[in-house]
Amino acid sequence: MPFNLKNRHLLSLVNHSPREIKYLLDLARDLKRAKYAGTEQPRLKGKNIALIFEKTSTRTRCSFEIAAYDQGANVTYIDPTSSQIGHKESMKDTARVLGRLYDAIEYRGYKQETVEELAKFSGVPVFNGLTDEFHPTQMLADVLTMIEHSTKPLNEIKYVYIGDARNNMGNSLLLIGAKLGMDVRICGPKSLLPEENFVSICEEISKETGARLTVTDDIDLAVKDADFVHTDVWVSMGEPIEAWGERINLLMPYQVNTDLMKRTGNPNVKFMHCLPAFHNCETKVGREIAAAYPNLANGIEVTEDVFESPMNIAFEQAENRMHTIKAVMVASLA
């Protein structure tokens, strides 16, 4: 079946077919090779892209900016302190203004409804840089990284996400694995697993793609024979440390440490993290947490020994954000 990604939004990957996702991954690999070889051709000359950031960012902002510059596009960075968004002007009105000025809009913020409103009213392609529900550009980078670190066909790769799984990472890793026919395990305390209705949507997708989906609180079941172990922070941006007590008690058994990695039974298992990671006390937040919870001084969701080991491929994952974001923009705008 033919497909066309021209002028397409990237909101969650729910509406992207497996073939379209694989095309974006292949394009990202081609663009990455071209950048390394010094043969990249700018295909977005004259394009202008607005980057709306309601949440702070390092990797997403840098990736969008470098990807755009590499391809000859211009960007404007917009944050809540430098615009009228949400103060004097609604997102709907903002969308209708920016859509007349820009060729595409990236949004990183809180509600999925907001990025969908931008897509509905702007009249230009909108790219989701992260919401509370989905993180599609991260998913493309994650799968590209797993492909690069595996000799297996895509549908034979086994990966587990472990920890607080009711967030954008848990949802998105379940969704993209279902779309691509992969062996996906989502593991965490029962109260921190993806919502049942979303799991049902992914299970319906898996019937078409042959994906194997496991959502469980059983760590040994989830990590057995895994090729890749993913995790994410246990606390969201802006949450007070005082609110961590119950969460930490729930999640401590799901911490990624040397023992958990050994429980996979795979000597070649790799560790992945969307970053930033709390793996030591070298940050202000890390020190505050260690002061309140001394048993976490050597790492929270992942321990220092795992993070600083050859198992960790999170920095290649971070680089691949840029290559996959570039692929999304080229496919939609070139």
Curated annotation (Swiss-Prot):
InterPro entries per record: Asp/Orn_carbamoyltranf_P-bd, Asp/Orn_carbamoylTrfase, Asp/Orn_carbamoylTrfase_sf, Asp_carbamoyltransf_Asp/Orn-bd, Orn/put_carbamltrans, OTCase_ArgI
Swiss-Prot/TrEMBL GO biological process terms: arginine biosynthetic process via ornithine; citrulline biosynthetic process; L-arginine biosynthetic process
Any single Gene Ontology cellular-component annotation: cytoplasm
Domain of life: Bacteria
MF terms in GO: amino acid binding; ornithine carbamoyltransferase activity
Subcellular location field: Cytoplasm
Binding residues for L-ornithine: 168, 232, 236-237
Matching PROSITE patterns: CARBAMOYLTRANSFERASE
Major place of residence: cytoplasm
Binding site for carbamoyl phosphate: 57-60, 84, 108, 135-138, 274-275, 321
EC number of the protein: 2.1.3.3
Alphabetical keyword list: Amino-acid biosynthesis, Arginine biosynthesis, Cytoplasm, Transferase
Reported function: Reversibly catalyzes the transfer of the carbamoyl group from carbamoyl phosphate (CP) to the N(epsilon) atom of ornithine (ORN) to produce L-citrulline.
Annotated protein name in UniProt: Ornithine carbamoyltransferase
Species per Swiss-Prot/TrEMBL record: Mannheimia succiniciproducens (strain KCTC 0769BP / MBEL55E)
Species classification: Bacteria, Pseudomonadati, Pseudomonadota, Gammaproteobacteria, Pasteurellales
